[in-house]
Amino acid sequence: MCRQFMYRLGIDLGGTNIVAGVVDENYEIIAKASCKTNVPRPESEICDSMADVALKAIEKAKLTIDDIESIGIGVPGAVNPKTGVIEYSANLFFHNWQVVKMMEERLNTKICVENDANAAALGEYLAGSAKGAKNAIAITLGTGIGGGIIINGKIYSGSNYAGAELGHMVIVKDGKECACGRKGCWEAYASATGLINLTKQEILKENFDFSYMLKSCDGDINKVTGKTAFDAVLAGDANAKAVIDEYIGYLACGLVNIINIFQPDILCIGGGISNQGENLLAPLRTIVEKERYTKHNDKQTVICKASLGTVSYTHLRAHETLRHL
């Protein structure tokens, strides 16, 4: 008997992890698998890893590749969804990578690729926190910062498929070096990587015997994550609070710039750090409200947590793209 619904699969190719998930008709992830990205390494090896985690996720869902209607791959950087080529990705160290062709050879099913934050924005617009909005922006906090912009219900990707690289606006002149080659980019300060670096810097300034942040990482500074400082704040660590306050200040700086330029109805924040919920969002909103250009309260941008996971919105982008082929 034929299945009435063909499942879809989303792959999030990040600078740190590759995550694949099978998604059902309710946009729910029913199974997923992951591995480390381990860049830099050859394109063929990355494709092998993506195919491997995809098949593992399908197996966990007790399905076969024949049950998968389409696969969407979300990638940071300049992505041409029409040609299936990743033209440039600073955090993955790739130029002109024909990822769709290589993945279709491995999995023998329909595949599309999209900038991960564009996919996030579309997913939130179609089925998430931005559903019903006319204009929306999604940012993803990960190895870098991705940005996706919806204007009048359509993704804005610019003339070279590299629009909305919001993480690469400079917020500190001659500041920290970014993977893109510039200095002072927003993502060098406000990405998960930026928070991890701030946390490590604070730990190195502390007395190791009394560092709650270090103790929470079993004394290994290399185990610091984006959660470390937040967890330490909840335990009453004043040094950790200083880290979080500085981090949220950097994050707010970029958000105010974005809101002043675009004035979206909703701005959704995704990525692992967004799981901190109101511990992140409440102080963030306070700063944005104080610094935004528009001061009247009749219609202000709503800042909220993205409600869909990465693999969910990459599958949605695949569905929308392939539906129009």
For the regions a protein language model found, what residue spans apply to each?
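A charged helix-plus-loop insertion that forms the helical arch/lid used to bind
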Residues: V85-H95
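Short beta-strand segments
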Residues: G72-P76, A138-G144, G148-I150
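A short acidic Gly-Thr/Ser loop motif
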Residues: D12-T16, T140-G144, A162
